[in-house]
Swiss-Prot record:
UniProt name for this protein: Trigger factor
Domain of life per record: Bacteria
PPIase FKBP-type domain sequence ranges: 162-243
Family statement: Belongs to the FKBP-type PPIase family. Tig subfamily.
Lineage of producing organism: Bacteria, Bacillati, Actinomycetota, Actinomycetes, Mycobacteriales
Length: 482
């Protein structure tokens, strides 16, 4: 087999392939053997019919079409392997010569990774915000912890923000009841904004037993996007009483003996979260600088495929109704033209980023180890609430392991870039990036940073949930409503 590569553009090539007929003869032999097992000819046992009779029965051209159809994908792969091209996406194949006894000739046009001239990574200078912790931020953490140990007490006054109320809801659209919007005894934290728009404003000022109507746009269900008249009735009002922030509370809520020790711990907790946020800013700034300094030719078909995927996902939930989609965008203060423009911009940036990261990974000779993949798998399994082995099976079934591998490699690459750059905060202080990205730009610290962020997020969620559970059943229901 002979193959040549013709460069059509920086991101697209045409591969010309010639396959001698003699190389296809084994394919014909296999095809006829399979056909002989399926076709019964008088006077011959199954699988024993002569090839000429089989050709006469099904036609030589039909057999040629079958053999060529089965042979082309493998020959294309062989041609790609023997060349230096790195395909992106599926090829467009055209068979230009197909005759029995003659060479098979076909072309394959495909998008490829372009050649990219990379900037001097050692000259990269990254500047990010310094870590600053305010008393208000620590107080917010303390308030959250106090709420965890708070109690709900009934009050005889109008509802206000922060109260927990039990409410009945009903709604009508065009004068007709909406059954799915009717509920009784629903617990809700006033001011949380967790239910429907306008509800909190309607509840504030209502006393037990009072009702109020308000107009809102339904966000889900059969009447999603339609204006509805909602009636809310307050059944009960409770306020959360918080424990005093003193030494006794510190001993109750933590392993510390004094409130000052507890505040120091909360300060460190805030600092830990901000360190992770700073690391994310470093990563994002590094990528931003690289994109600004590097020209990356974009393969249009790959960009368009990403655009098509985004559009499909956006309107799939609307049964691909373009009119409803346009109405939804209008309600958000946007338009289809703005959506399309933003989608293209984001798609181009995403493709450019992937191509740039892959080129950098090649230049830096980034290797993905088994430990890197295992760390990512464990991290993802925590995020999805699955066992690592279960998630691995899902990724294998959906052929998503290559995508995970590529993502891990890109993470290792940006870590290596950051490690080699000069990183300072806006006050001019050097930032030790090894804490986040490892001494050699590895993924271990990156994964640990992500773990810290997840742990802090989980702790916040647990705090809210435990607060509701410890305080009152109604608060539990309010959490569910959120």
């Amino acid at each position: 087999m002979k193959s040549t590569v013709e460069k059509l553009s920086p991101t697209r090539v045409r591969i010309n392939v010639e396959v001698p007929f003699t190389e296809l003869e084994p394919d014909f032999d296999r095809a006829f053997k399979e056909l002989a097992k399926q076709v019964r000819l008088p006077g011959f046992r199954p699988g024993k019919a002569p090839r000429k009779l089989l050709e006469a029965r099904v036609g030589r051209e039909a057999m040629l079409d079958q053999v060529v159809g089965e042979a082309v994908p493998g020959r294309y792969t062989e041609a790609v392997t023997s060349s230096d091209v790195q395909p992106l996406g599926q090829p467009e194949i055209e068979i230009t010569k197909k005759e029995y006894g003659e060479d098979l000739v076909f072309t394959a046009e495909v998008d490829v990774r372009p050649e990219i001239t990379l900037p001097d990574l050692s000259a990269l200078e990254i500047t990010v915000d310094p870590i600053e912790i305010t008393d208000e931020e620590v107080d917010t953490e303390l308030q959250s912890l106090r709420a965890r140990f708070g109690t709900l007490t009934g009050v005889d006054r109008p509802a206000k923000d922060g109260d927990f109320v039990s409410i009945d809801l009903s709604a009508t659209v065009d004068g007709k009841d909406v059954p799915e919007a009717t509920t009784e005894g629903l617990s809700h934290e006033v001011g949380s904004g967790q239910l429907i728009e306008g509800l909190d404003d309607a509840i504030v000022g209502l006393s037990e037993g009072e009702s109020k109507e308000f107009t809102t746009t339904l966000a889900a269900g059969e009447h999603a996007g339609k204006e509805a008249v909602v009636t809310v009735t307050v059944k009960s009002i409770k306020e959360r009483e918080l424990p005093e922030p003193d030494d006794e509370f510190a001993q109750l809520a933590s392993e510390f003996d004094t409130i000052d020790e507890l505040k120091e711990s909360l300060t460190e907790q805030v600092r830990r979260v901000k360190r992770v946020q700073q690391a994310e800013q470093i990563r994002d700034k590094a990528l931003e600088l690289l994109l600004e300094q590097t020209e990356v030719p974009l393969p249009e078909k790959i960009v368009q495929a990403q655009i098509d995927d985004t559009v499909h996902n956006a309107i799939h939930g609307l049964d691909h109704d373009e009119d409803r989609f346009a109405e939804q965008l209008a309600e958000q203060g946007s338009s289809r033209e703005e959506f399309d423009a933003n989608t293209r911009t984001e798609a181009e940036k995403a493709v450019k980023t992937q191509l740039l990261m892959d080129a950098l990974a090649d230049q830096l000779e980034v290797q993905v180890g088994q430990g890197d993949l295992t760390e990512r798998l464990v991290l993802m399994s925590r995020q999805y609430g699955l066992e690592p082995q279960q998630l691995l099976q899902i990724l294998q079934q959906n052929n998503q392991l290559p995508a995970m591998f590529a993502d891990v490699r890109r993470g290792l690459t940006i870590a290596a870039v950051v490690h080699g750059a000069t990183v300072k905060d806006t006050d001019g202080n050097d930032i030790d990036t090894t804490e986040f990205f490892g001494p050699s730009g590895g993924a271990q610290a990156e994964a640990e940073g992500a773990d810290e962020a997840d742990a802090d997020s989980d702790a916040d969620s647990d705090t809210e949930a435990d607060s509701d559970a410890d305080s009152d059943t109604e608060a539990d229901e309010a959490d569910e409503a959120k």
